[in-house]
Amino acid sequence: MAAYPESCVDTTVLDFVADLSLASPRRPLLCDFAPGVSLGDPALALREGRPRRMARFEEGDPEEEECEVDQGDGEEEEEEERGRGVSLLGRPKRKRVITYAQRQAANIRERKRMFNLNEAFDQLRRKVPTFAYEKRLSRIETLRLAIVYISFMTELLESCEKKESG
């Protein structure tokens, strides 16, 4: 961006280009500039990712859409700054509501998954040779030892095949 003058590439222009990229070919542009406003006008303060003098995009019939100047009060801005997410179209994101029964079912599935995983690791621990006096191996230690054991057995088989063929 250093090759372009700063006045040509500022956040207002970039936001305008981003809004234009969301436009559908069947619909008019997402919004119009108010008459007499230049892109370098400092009055184009950003709100919800677009300039204030640019009208909000509302879904509906394209003929019925009228772009109005967004005057908005400060309360909406404060609510959004508190962490409530906003989608590209300016609507608040819906939080997924999980019922008690769904949570219980998910907990049961997770317990079953963990039980099966622990069973598989116990079976692997029994197959991998370890010293009898060692404490129970952790999962990562079991996997690393299994890798070494499999590599050793593979080399042993390959050396036996070479002796038989040669």
Swiss-Prot record:
The keyword Amino-acid biosynthesis does not apply. GO terms for cellular component: chromatin; nucleus. It is found in: Nucleus. Heterodimer with TCF3/E12. Interacts with the bHLH domain of TCF3/E12. Residues 60-80 have a biased composition (Acidic residues). Its main location: nucleus. Changing residue 36 to R: In a colorectal cancer sample; somatic mutation. Keywords: DNA-binding, Nucleus, Repressor, Transcription, Transcription regulation. GO terms for biological process: cell development; developmental process; floor plate development; negative regulation of DNA-templated transcription; regulation of dopaminergic neuron differentiation; regulation of neurogenesis; regulation of transcription by RNA polymerase II. Residues 101-153 form the bHLH domain. Transcription factor that binds to the E-box and functions as inhibitor of transcription. DNA binding requires dimerization with an E protein. Inhibits transcription activation by ASCL1/MASH1 by sequestering E proteins. The keyword DNA-binding applies. This is Fer3-like protein. It holds the Pfam family HLH. It comes from Homo sapiens. One of its GO terms (molecular function) is RNA polymerase II transcription regulatory region sequence-specific DNA binding. Residues 57-88 are annotated as: Disordered.
